[in-house]
Each structure stands twice: as C-alpha cells, then as structure tokens.
C-alpha cells in the first residue's frame, strides 16, 4: 500500500510542478502559485485521507452494522468461515465481518488498507440470496480489498480535489483581472463568486472522472469475485441483483464499494459508481468464453 501511495504522490507532485511551470509561463505569480499548490494539496488530499482513515468507523455508525465477534447462528458462522477462506486465498488479512439492517440486496467493503478492512452484508441479502450467490458477493467485496480500491479511490479523489481547487482559483483570477482591467489580479467579491462557480463546474467533471474509474474498478472486482467463488456463482449473484427492486440505503461514503449501484441513462449514467448489471454479466460471460 505504501509503495502505491509513494508512487502516486510522486507522479502527481511532478504533474503539479509542471502545472506550476505552465502557469508561470502564462504570467501567474510564481510565489502565489507555489502557495496555492501547497494549500490545494493539503486540503485536497487531507480530506480524502481523513475519510479513508475514518471509513470503518463511519460505515459502522451510518449503517448500524453489527460486527460478528462470536457467531450466534449458522449463517453468521458461515459468513465468518467464507470470508476467512476468501481472505486467505486473496492474500489479505482477515477483515471484520458485519451485518446491517437493510431491505435491499447489498454489501460493501471499506477500510484504510488490505489488512484492516470491513466487509458488511445487508439482512436483505441474507434473506434473498442462496449461499452460492452470497459467496460470490463476498468474493466481490474481498476483491475490492485485495485490489486496494479504497486507497486508490482516496488518492484519485485527492488529486481531483487538488486540481479543482487550483484551476478554479487560477482561471478565476484570470477572468477577474480581465473583467476588472487589473492585471495584478483583483480579489474583490466578484472573484470569489467566479471561483465558487468554477469549483462547481470543475467539481462535476471531477466527479465524472472518479465515477468512470469506479465503474472500471467494478469489472475488476467482479472478475476477482468470479476467481474466488466461481464464475457461474458470480453471474448468478448479479442476475439476482437485477431482480432486486429495493431502494439503495447505503450511505454515500460507502455506496461506491457496494455490490449494487444505481440505475440511470444518458447524462445520469456518467455519475453512477457502478456499470449496468447487464454489462457486468456480459463481461463475465465474455471472459468465460475467451477462457475456453
């Protein structure tokens, strides 16, 4: 995990330095630019990493998930044994296993690293899926943990936050100075209105990028679930999800790591964290056909 963080931060430091050079060539004050880059990186990455570190605590609190410490029923015993077996196969530490009240068929994984994760399933999943289907869902969530998706998404969000902050202020300064005729860059009330509007616009594009990456990550988690539980079980689980008409009650901070996402067409699809279930099923079937 630390190698991934180091390489990611190193790459983005180089990008930020390049951005600083470009802005200097455009006439932006280098001293102001350096301070802006530092401030943006602190706020951009700071929020993402605080959310990552608190993710397990917040997920438990927001969903009311109850961690299974000592299994009291055959179902709880099966959950622990299945997660333990899959975690060993994936080469990660044993996650905490929890159950939360929810009518929808869903599950999620969260945590700061591969060896300190939480996997939770809804009561709706336990009531509406058989063990083969539930095993595939657990495999999907274990694959999220093994792939380091929580850390990667936090890093990506940090970079996007940083660029939104920087670009909004740089472009806002240029627009404000052009409109006011002050080449030194005005900092009046209009500047802050412009920056606020630009942050909203750039934030939408940043969300599209993050959700695009999230959708690609779901295909990988499906493939990982198929490897851990079996391709036919993973396909059956997704087909079962396609029949689920329950409302997604997962809190926003863990929805991206659930097995089931929203439904949308057109522009709304650009803001969905999960691909359509039909595409996920087709991808698994195509992979099965190419493997023969």
From Swiss-Prot:
The keyword Metal-binding applies. The active site is at 141. Keywords: Cell inner membrane, Cell membrane, Hydrolase, Membrane, Metal-binding, Metalloprotease, Protease, Transmembrane, Transmembrane helix, Zinc. One of its GO terms (molecular function) is zinc ion binding. GO terms for biological process: proteolysis. Binds 1 zinc ion per subunit. Zn(2+) binds at residues 140, 144, 218. GO terms for cellular component: plasma membrane. Its cofactor is Zn(2+). The chain crosses the membrane at residues 5-25, 34-54, 155-175, 193-213. It comes from the Bacteria. InterPro entries: HtpX_protease (IPR050083), Pept_M48_protease_HtpX (IPR022919), Peptidase_M48 (IPR001915). CDD domains: M48B_HtpX_like. Pfam families: Peptidase_M48. It is a multi-pass membrane protein. Belongs to the peptidase M48B family. HAMAP family: Pept_M48_protease_HtpX. This is Protease HtpX. It comes from Xanthomonas axonopodis pv. citri (strain 306). The gene is htpX.
